[in-house]
């Protein structure tokens, strides 16, 4: 007799890390508020990089938190936060920490709400092999195709 075992909840791997974060009303301007969300995965990671995703999330949150109420355009803050993440990753690479190359997958999304104008804008950037789909009129569209941390999608 053959016995098959199905695992719907595979055991956690010690070399794979996931991080989700959300910062509600992290940026409050004169005419808008901004929420930032992110998802990250680091696979095949060494123990020394177990907190890499936490460091990236902290960088993003600090970049937003240090902005004052004088911010006019939330997209510039988003792009500045991405530059900080890029600089951090470049520094890690220069220091010889290259374990994350090819194993880091991130997506950042920022929604800015403009109540007076009754509009919402979003900014999106990704790094690595991650896909972001938009469901619209019974269709799924990969809106992050070809986008990277260097080329943010704003709309």
Residue ranges with predicted function:
Residues 143-155:
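Conserved, helical-rich catalytic subdomain that frames metal- and/or nucleotide-binding sites
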Residues 137-143:
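A short alpha->loop->secondary-structure connector
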Residues 57-98:
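Helix-loop-helix
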Residues 69-71, 103, 147:
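Intrinsically disordered, low-complexity regions
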Residues 1-64, 97-125, 130-137:
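N-terminal entry segment of metal-dependent catalytic domains or homologous docking segments
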């Amino acid at each position: 007799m053959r016995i098959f075992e199905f695992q719907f909840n595979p055991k956690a791997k010690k070399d794979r890390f996931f991080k989700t974060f959300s910062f509600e009303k992290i940026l409050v301007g004169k005419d808008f508020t901004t929420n930032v969300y992110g998802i990250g995965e680091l696979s095949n990671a060494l123990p020394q990089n177990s907190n890499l995703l936490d460091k990236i999330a902290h960088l993003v949150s600090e970049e937003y938190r240090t902005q004052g109420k004088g911010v006019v355009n939330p997209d510039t803050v988003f792009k500045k936060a991405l530059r900080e993440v890029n600089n951090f990753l470049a520094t890690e690479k220069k220091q010889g920490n290259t374990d994350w190359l090819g194993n880091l997958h991130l997506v950042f999304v920022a929604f800015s709400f403009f109540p007076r104008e009754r509009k919402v804008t979003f900014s999106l950037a990704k790094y690595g092999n991650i896909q972001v789909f938009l469901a619209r009129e019974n269709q799924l569209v990969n809106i992050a195709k070809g986008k990277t941390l260097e080329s943010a999608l704003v709309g």
